[in-house]
């Protein structure tokens, strides 16, 4: 399978068409951004690490009956995927208070939520990806009520699988972002699952092991990403 035309280039990945109309190649970049592209930089070998982690986690979810866009890992940076019609809803699942949840509602960082929170955000960089509810999403025409129910249910199921997986590897899954898309009349999980899209804290020390280290100039970004990769793959 080879790349043909560049279909889309985002902050962290490029997506290429292939000689099969329903398949694309997702190429992971080392570019790093934060605060909706206001901060930019690079993280050495981030693309390699995120591809490896994402492929492993998509495979894990498939094993638990959760359908994803993954077809196979092609190379260190390339993932062969089913082509999706992306739903313009970013789904965020929160287990522990951090980030914007702390700023918006005054939770103390690290507060363990009684139940996981599932939030919807409009996928629109120009509007800074605003928080929205089901009524907003339907009014905007980005998803139907039925689709939103599927996204919420799917996100909750993914959270159950991933929380246990990471706990077994001495990591707290604080929160994470998911993207979904339509493919041949079904909704599949797309994008990636990585330290770019998740908050990971060490189970014993609460050390942050994700893109917050880049966001807030904490240093040790590459080491944190590599350590997450090591833990994700170490029991395979």
UniProtKB/Swiss-Prot annotation:
Signal peptide: none annotated. One of its GO terms (molecular function) is ATP binding. It comes from the Bacteria. It catalyses: 5-amino-1-(5-phospho-D-ribosyl)imidazole-4-carboxylate + L-aspartate + ATP = (2S)-2-[5-amino-1-(5-phospho-beta-D-ribosyl)imidazole-4-carboxamido]succinate + ADP + phosphate + 2 H(+). It holds the Pfam family SAICAR_synt. SUPFAM superfamilies: SAICAR synthase-like (SSF56104). Its EC number is 6.3.2.6. Gene3D superfamilies: ATP-grasp fold, B domain, Phosphorylase Kinase, domain 1. One of its GO terms (biological process) is cobalamin biosynthetic process. CDD domains: SAICAR_synt_PurC. Keywords: ATP-binding, Ligase, Nucleotide-binding, Purine biosynthesis. Pathway: Purine metabolism; IMP biosynthesis via de novo pathway; 5-amino-1-(5-phospho-D-ribosyl)imidazole-4-carboxamide from 5-amino-1-(5-phospho-D-ribosyl)imidazole-4-carboxylate: step 1/2. Belongs to the SAICAR synthetase family. PANTHER family: MULTIFUNCTIONAL PROTEIN ADE2, SI:DKEY-6E2.2. This is Phosphoribosylaminoimidazole-succinocarboxamide synthase. It comes from Chlorobium phaeobacteroides (strain DSM 266 / SMG 266 / 2430).
